[in-house]
Amino acid sequence: MDKFYLSTIDENAHLLAKKHGFGIEIAEFCTPWFLDTDFAEIDPKIREKMTCSDRFVLHAPFSELFPCAIDPKVRAIAAERYRQVIRVAEGYGIRKIVVHGGYNPRIYFPIWYTGRQTSQNVSFEE
């Protein structure tokens, strides 16, 4: 069961993870502004959930983030949020982060998006 993770989107996921030996996906920061506004409130709850397992992944923010956007300023905002979540993961000792690329077939041509996704135009380095 070492490859299964339960998402904390379900408020009881940590208890089920403990019962069945699963890992936990910390999903509290899927909404980007929680990194800024609600961290102090969320942090102790996350730490409590982390007592129920020894394996974790942190879900990066994804709402309204487009790391492969056409607009370089939009890409810069996404990169900043990812840098934030990398620091948060380090603070929790989490080494795996789930990141969504923001692909929307109604906005991007697949060939253009794939090229952008794999290019050096998206950087998370500070």
PLM features: residue spans?
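Active-site acidic/histidine proton-transfer and metal-coordination neighborhood
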Residues: 71-126
